[in-house]
């Protein structure tokens, strides 16, 4: 599958970038400037990704750099103020630590390849996964409890004119029937040991009592960090929840995220369906 290879190429390029990165930014990521053999991505979609970064206030600088022969634009930014704000919510599952924009695009593309038609990002941060889903013509919804982050999403929406439907609400309280979903994929924003399991359990229980159960995919972001995983090493820390709720893993892909920039192993995204 094409996106498996693109994901592998991105992981490899990230390692090269990490070795050569001499900046001092709080966060940094790159997006290829144009389509290539390693990144055969629609040029218009690439442009939309650059637009997201250019119009997102968390990034304050960008420059072009060749990484392993591929011309990329590097975006540098700072999420400290958003991070500090995001930890004040009692039921918020995780501080704001986004995935990379290109990782968000690949993750949404994989969901689309399984013929899912709607994407709901739970704990969506600055909305990047929902934004990419909208670019890919999926019906997207971006659910975030933090009002400051939703304000940020609305700024991006206004500037890019891509409406990825940000909703400021507690995902645990939200009534998903309002979205009229038919074949949705839910992305759970939160690592299992940082409250993501509470969020996931709630969503799974809501879905499993409806007709959606047979047509739903749930995607978890995992971790391979031993420090964060006490009891549960497999499936990125999600295996006990996956087993408990009778889910089956249909795909796992590793993608760079802000929190794995300096690590050799990136973040596993685990795609599951109800059995």
Please state what every model-predicted region is.
Residues 2-114, 152-181:
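S-adenosyl-L-methionine
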């Amino acid at each position: 599958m094409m996106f498996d290879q693109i994901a592998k190429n991105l992981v490899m390029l990230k390692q090269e970038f990490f070795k050569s990165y001499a900046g001092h930014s709080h966060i940094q990521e790159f997006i290829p400037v144009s389509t290539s053999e390693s990144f055969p991505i629609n040029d218009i979609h690439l442009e939309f990704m650059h637009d997201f970064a250019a119009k997102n206030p968390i990034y304050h600088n960008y420059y072009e750099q060749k990484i392993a022969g591929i011309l990329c634009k590097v975006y540098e930014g700072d999420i400290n103020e958003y991070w500090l704000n995001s930890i004040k919510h009692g039921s918020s599952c995780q501080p704001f630590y986004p995935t990379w924009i290109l990782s968000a695009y690949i993750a949404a593309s994989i969901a689309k390849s399984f013929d899912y038609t709607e994407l709901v990002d739970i704990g969506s941060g600055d909305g990047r996964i929902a934004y990419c889903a909208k670019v890919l013509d999926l019906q997207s919804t971006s659910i975030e409890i933090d009002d400051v982050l939703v304000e940020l999403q609305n700024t991006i929406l206004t500037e890019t004119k891509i409406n990825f439907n940000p909703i400021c609400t507690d995902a645990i309280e939200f009534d998903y029937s309002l979205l009229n979903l038919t074949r949705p994929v839910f992305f759970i924003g939160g690592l299992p040991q940082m409250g993501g399991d509470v969020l996931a359990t709630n969503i799974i229980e809501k879905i499993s009592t409806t007709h959606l159960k047979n047509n739903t995919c749930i995607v978890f972001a995992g971790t391979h960090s031993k420090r964060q995983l006490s009891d549960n090493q497999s499936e990125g820390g999600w295996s006990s929840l996956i087993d408990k709720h009778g889910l089956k893993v249909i795909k796992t892909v590793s993608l760079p995220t802000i929190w794995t920039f300096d690590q050799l192993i990136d973040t596993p995204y685990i795609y599951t369906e109800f059995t």
